[in-house]
Design a protein with these regions (language model features):
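Intrinsically disordered, low-complexity non-transmembrane regions of multi-pass membrane transporters
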Residues: 1-11, 205-220, 255-259, 269, ...
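C-terminal ends of transmembrane helices
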Residues: 3, 54-65, 106-119, 168-178, ...
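Membrane-embedded helical hairpins/re-entrant loop segments and their flanking transmembrane helices
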Residues: 5, 31-67, 236-306, 429-433
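Hydrophobic, membrane-embedded alpha-helices of multi-pass small-molecule transporters
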Residues: 6-19, 155-167, 184-185, 200, ...
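The first (N-terminal) embedded transmembrane alpha-helix
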Residues: 12-29, 73-80
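Membrane helical hairpin/interfacial module
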Residues: 39, 47, 57-116
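Short, non-helical or kinked segments that cap or interrupt transmembrane helices
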Residues: 43, 65-78, 119-128, 181-187, ...
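Membrane-embedded alpha-helical modules
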Residues: 87-204, 313, 318-426
Length: 438
């Protein structure tokens, strides 16, 4: 049965709502951490929403060069939050976008053969990395629950009550609602929390009234990018981790749509993601990855048509052209965001643990990979000054929990699993050769 335009439009809006909270939280966290003005923050949210639409269309409108052609929605990756904040603090905003541009180019280059590197990123690595991502983001959530780091009312009871009300709403909706309402429970929690905060005197609409009605998208809004080795390496690691995450989403959607993905399909998907990251750097947005929450919505609705996602991409681009829509997101109090972040980042941790559950922990090597990578990732997050005496080129790699933990997981996997398999294969070949000789 064919979908009418009205139904396709409504389904497209559902996908926008399902990913909207995750899409706006990243620019809000990053923008506030880097001390952007209200005008700059409004632009950052606007361009991010716009580029989410562009990135989505690059993937769904498949051609011979790029695009996986599945009903996939792309959004800014949470993996990049901590590294972007660290790069911005150490090198400035120009280096942030220089590193994003460089990582986008890297993804495009490795897209031709990344599928062959899967042995370097098994579940023991990806599960550890995703778990570390959630853990290292949790301090951001806790600071926001208290009112925002450095705020005059940090830790006040009103902020904590507001944050826990939002968290409670999300938990209750997850428990008692079904279908689409359940899929947008975080967005509903943020909206209700902001409504309550208004009556507590914590919401001001000046930013909305001051915002322009329409805004043209422009490249290099924050100035020309600069390129430094350490930020580029850091963001390249983030991009590769995002590719691994996206691969899981691609295969999940392939199963849902009864489509067997080939290596060529994956390469085109990676290439589209690389283009999205490159454009994100040029237009001062973010790195992009496939959003898993929209996979759940495809499963819930049973509608697997690419036309729905095309509509989603167009809606996102349209939203990005109207700053007043973005300005509404800047009025959300930090405590409200903090309550929602606990749920979102906690879900990231839970998803990482779920990925780790598929591992054979009877092998001591896997236990050690998880132990060392998660341990170092958490340790560096709690004590960021531990590697302060190292050269400045290395500190960005060692003082970020996500990067430190990811590098540890990849190296240990190579040592314990990749090399050991190669040695085992070589021994078997020698044994066969000896038997043949006899």
């Amino acid at each position: 049965m064919k979908n009418g335009f009205g139904k396709t439009l409504s389904l497209g809006i559902q996908h926008v709502l399902a990913m909207y909270a995750g899409a706006i939280v990243v620019p809000l966290i990053v923008g506030k951490a880097m001390g952007l003005t209200v005008e700059q923050l409004t632009y950052l949210v606007s361009i991010d929403i716009f580029m989410c639409g562009v990135a989505t269309l690059l993937q769904v409108l498949s051609n011979r060069f790029f695009g996986i052609g599945l009903p996939v929605v792309l959004g800014c990756t949470f993996t990049a939050v901590s590294p972007i904040i660290a790069i911005g603090a150490e090198y400035g905003v120009s280096a942030v976008y220089g590193s994003i541009i460089a990582s986008g180019i890297l993804v495009i280059l490795i897209s031709f053969f990344f599928g062959k590197l899967a042995s370097f990123f098994p579940p023991v690595v990806t599960g550890s990395v995703v778990t570390i991502i959630g853990i290292t983001l949790m301090p951001v959530a806790m600071n926001n629950m208290a009112g925002g780091e450095g705020s005059a009312d940090f830790g006040e009871l009103s902020n904590l009550v507001l944050a826990f009300v939002v968290l409670s709403i999300i938990v209750l909706l997850y428990r008692f609602s079904k279908g689409f309402i359940k899929s947008i429970s975080i967005l509903i929690g943020i909206l209700i929390g902001t409504f309550i905060a208004y009556f507590m005197g914590k919401v001001q609409f000046d930013n909305v009234s001051d915002a322009a009605a329409v805004q043209m998208i422009q490249p290099f809004y924050f100035g020309m990018p600069s390129f430094h080795a350490a930020p580029i390496i850091t963001m390249s690691i983030v991009a590769i981790v995002s590719l691994v995450e996206s691969t899981g989403v691609y295969f999940a959607l392939g199963d849902l749509t009864n489509r067997r993905l080939t290596e060529k399909d994956l390469s085109k998907g990676y290439r589209a993601e690389g283009l999205a990251v490159l454009l994100g750097g040029i237009f001062n947005a973010f790195p992009y990855t496939a959003f898993s929450q929209n996979v759940g919505l495809v499963q819930l609705t049973g509608i697997k048509k690419n036309a729905v996602i095309v509509v989603t991409g167009i809606i996102l681009m349209a939203f990005g052209l109207f700053p007043k829509i973005a300005a509404f997101t800047t009025i959300i109090p930090s405590a409200v965001l903090g309550g929602a972040m606990v749920a979102m980042f906690g879900m990231v941790i839970a998803y990482g643990i779920k990925m780790l559950s598929r591992i054979d922990f009877a092998k001591q090597e896997n236990l050690l990979i998880v132990a060392c990578s998660v341990g170092l990732g958490l340790g560096v997050t709690v004590v960021p000054d531990i590697f302060k005496q190292l050269p400045s080129a290395l500190t960005l790699l060692t003082t970020n929990g996500i990067v430190a933990g990811s590098i540890t997981a990849v190296i240990l996997n190579i040592v314990y699993n990749v090399f050991s398999r190669a040695e085992k294969t070589e021994r078997n070949a020698d044994a066969i050769e000896q038997k043949t000789a006899v």
